[in-house]
Amino acid sequence: MSATLTGSGTALGFSCSSKISKRVSSSPASNRCCIKMSVSVDEKKKSFSLQKSEEAFNAAKNLMPGGVNSPVRAFKSVGGQPVLIDSVKGSKMWDIDGNEYIDYVGSWGPAIIGHADDEVLAALAETMKKGTSFGAPCLLENVLAEMVISAVPSIEMVRFVNSGTEACMGVLRLARAFTNKEKFIKFEGCYHGHANAFLVKAGSGVATLGLPDSPGVPKAATSDTLTAPYNDLEAVEKLFAAHKGEISAVILEPVVGNSGFIPPTPEFINGLRQLTKDNGVLLIFDEVMTGFRLAYGGAQEYFGITPDLTTLGKIIGGGLPVGAYGGRRDIMEMVAPAGPMYQAGTLSGNPLAMTAGIHTLKRLKQAGTYEYLDKITKELTNGILEAGKKTGHPMCGGYISGMFGFFFAEGPVYNFADSKKSDTEKFGRFFRGMLEEGVYFAPSQFEAGFTSLAHTPEDIQLTIAAAERVLSRI
């Protein structure tokens, strides 16, 4: 079967290698036990109020553009009142009105072991006694670097930065420096941060707000950015032919999470590796989202494909600001001060981020981690799609390990153009309904969802039951 998002209540299966087939076929069967809710649905609806969030958000709009510090948080694409979060723990969040939510955003991916993990908090408290920022090398950088290098197949050396955007900026500059070529290929709907060169047919908040690009990006900054539809190897071949000898790299999300959840077809992901090798072009996996989430070694371990360079973020900081890029030693040795490609950062290698990352990765390395994520995410995704089928809503969706997504569309969804066929107005109604039920999904049809080790079977069952109620009334 092809690696697509399938409709009518069927979750994603992969067959691009025997390893992946075995992994999917051996996934634990879903356990549809009946869970008694401690608070009735009517009581929950009656008590649901966002008055304090509304007041605080109205004040915020006079202080910050749109009232937020990242656009998708403003709920513009889903409507309704943005919630202001007061605290988090495990799989739950509480807003300033006291409402509790089962959280499937996980701070947009980092909270894979659960929010405010006790061991991570204790380790951070110990590190903070020594200081919050050194602006100098520390042993914690060595520890996390060794963990990343031992885990991620493509990484022989790594450079820590402060965000996924920084990581992608650095890796593109490095690819251009190493190849002495300036053009690169990205895919429509893939998001690699908000640096000028990447804001062309981008996903994430750009897609959420329905923007083609962004004002303020000079044409010169994107003149060497080439784009192709995701999962379209022929389009890449045509770009290679049209710009022979001019392309430095191809960068992609190995599983798209910023146009919704879109996996690669086996033909595409394998063909892309061979095509870049044949043409002397560097292959870059942007694993800011998929790194340490699909498997301990990320998407490249999961698919059995080793890129030349990789970007990381989110999980490797355990919820603190972080990013990283790494790859082959001969390429990475071009980075200053070892080489001439300059990149620097005041807070890079921050001891708090290193500490949180170390303890998060230690937890993820424990036996059974990814089997558990696969089990609960399979049950969640299948349950939501089955609820859509029961209530007569065309839906499609899929999952890999602790990452999932669904669209209000027949499907299949192979690329950004397909994802935009989704009924975003219906998704908005679904999102708002689930919020009232105490379930927090990403406030955009064009963002993937995440499970964590803190999510319980009860969380999953309550979410599925809530989804069926909401879908029956929208």
UniProtKB/Swiss-Prot annotation:
- Cofactor(s) annotated in UniProt: pyridoxal 5'-phosphate
Q: Does the keyword Protein biosynthesis apply?
A: no
Q: Which SUPFAM superfamilies match?
A: PLP-dependent transferases
The residue span given for the transit peptide is 1-38
Compartment(s) where it occurs, according to its Swiss-Prot or TrEMBL record? Plastid, Chloroplast
Cite the cofactor comment. Can use both pyridoxamine 5'-phosphate (PMP) and pyridoxal 5'-phosphate (PLP) as cofactors.
Entries under InterPro entries matching the protein? 4pyrrol_synth_GluAld_NH2Trfase (IPR004639), Aminotrans_3 (IPR005814), Aminotrans_3_PPA_site (IPR049704), PyrdxlP-dep_Trfase (IPR015424), PyrdxlP-dep_Trfase_major (IPR015421), PyrdxlP-dep_Trfase_small (IPR015422)
Q: Which UniProt keywords apply?
A: Chlorophyll biosynthesis, Chloroplast, Isomerase, Plastid, Porphyrin biosynthesis, Pyridoxal phosphate, Transit peptide
State the pathway, as annotated in the record.
Answer: Porphyrin-containing compound metabolism; protoporphyrin-IX biosynthesis; 5-aminolevulinate from L-glutamyl-tRNA(Glu): step 2/2; Porphyrin-containing compound metabolism; chlorophyll biosynthesis
Top-level taxon of origin? Eukaryota
Which EC number applies?
A: 5.4.3.8
Its annotated function is as follows: Transaminase converting glutamate 1-semialdehyde (GSA) to 5-aminolevulinate (ALA). Involved in the biosynthesis of tetrapyrroles.
Subunit organization: Homodimer.
Q: Which family does it belong to?
A: Belongs to the class-III pyridoxal-phosphate-dependent aminotransferase family. HemL subfamily.
What's the protein here called?
Answer: Glutamate-1-semialdehyde 2,1-aminomutase 1, chloroplastic
